[in-house]
Amino acid sequence: MSSSSRKAHFMHTNAVYWPNYRVYNGDTPGQLNYGCINRVHYAFANVTADGGVFLSDEWADAQAPCDGVQGALGSFMHLKQRYRHLQVVLSIGGGDSAETFPIVASSAVLRDNFARSARGLVEASGLNGIDIVWEYPCTPEQGRDFLALVAAIRIHLPEDRYLLTATLPAAKPVLQNIDLRQTAEYLDTLNLTAYDFFGHWSHKSGHHAQLYAMSKDETSGAAGVKDLMSSGVPGKKILLGIPLFGRSFLGVAGPGHKNRGAGGKDGSFEYNQLPRKGTKEQVDKRAVAAQCVGADGGFVTYDNPDTVKMKATFCKQKGLGGLFYWSAPSDAKDSKRSLIATGFKALHSS
């Protein structure tokens, strides 16, 4: 089946990430609304130093009771039969594989091992393909190895049968290491993580998923898209990332200020917990960012339905492929507050 015919059901891609650890929170794949989702990135599989690819949690992936079947991955494979438009790809990497990716990608033998191992896992599980999440190619040499890796994968996962995607940050120091035009030739989509621009690690508060920067020294989703497209990546291959979580800062009422640390769990709140009780939600239309401020001075920055609509409009204006969301279980259950549903409707509205 060709890449174009696989995507014929939707004019734009509306993809979600689903981390396997959410099984332990009582979340299951069957809880999602597949009327507005056409791709799931199942996260994460890990990489060994010899190039092997393996599922990271056998119980969560293949044994836990999920929607009447065994394992969250098993549930997605079952749902794929019910929703014929649904693609499920295996996201390989993340933080646990940050140290092994540079080793594997630097060797032709290990790159081939990786590609063969990934294909075996894809075929055994009935997946549509894989997503490379190397955090991150930090030098020009690693950038060249990244290109060599995706080229090696395409030999074993040909584009007429399998999806191949990669996830990269909207950060010039990373993107400038990679020949993006050549890399994009091997990919179905390049997923741009247009969030985490600010957080508990930052010296000042800021909108963590802003579409437009508020000063020259800040990055933004629009800047990341510009970097990709000016480097030769076709707009239709770019997915803009939407966070289903907010970043918090204590002791400030907005962006651009020194703060007293972070509130919430690890400095963040799941989107379905926002806006916080007792706060008023506001939208910064210039940055395209939502926020709420608590009585304790806690400033939380995130996306809401209004900002997602604006980002979807941006995608259509720039000719981008669509949106993706990290991560699906954190979305609001109310369809009017759901960012996934809002994004789908906005992408497909005239």
Briefly describe each language-model feature range.
Residues 20-35, 106-124, 172-183, 221, ...:
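Short, acidic/polar
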Residues 2-122, 338-341, 348:
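Glycan-recognition patch characteristic of GH18 chitinases/ENGases
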Residues 15, 19, 50-70, 135-276:
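Substrate-binding surface in catalytic domains of secreted glycosidases
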Residues 40, 90, 132, 153, ...:
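Conserved, mostly hydrophobic/aromatic
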Residues 56-57, 198-200, 237-317, 333, ...:
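Glycan-binding loop/region signatures in secreted carbohydrate-active enzymes
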Residues 117-143, 192, 196, 324:
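Active-site groove signature of glycoside hydrolases
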Residues 70-77, 115-122, 143, 147-154, ...:
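Generic structural signal for well-ordered alpha-helices
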Residues 10-12, 36, 84-88, 126-130, ...:
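Short, well-ordered coil/turn segments that N-cap beta-strands
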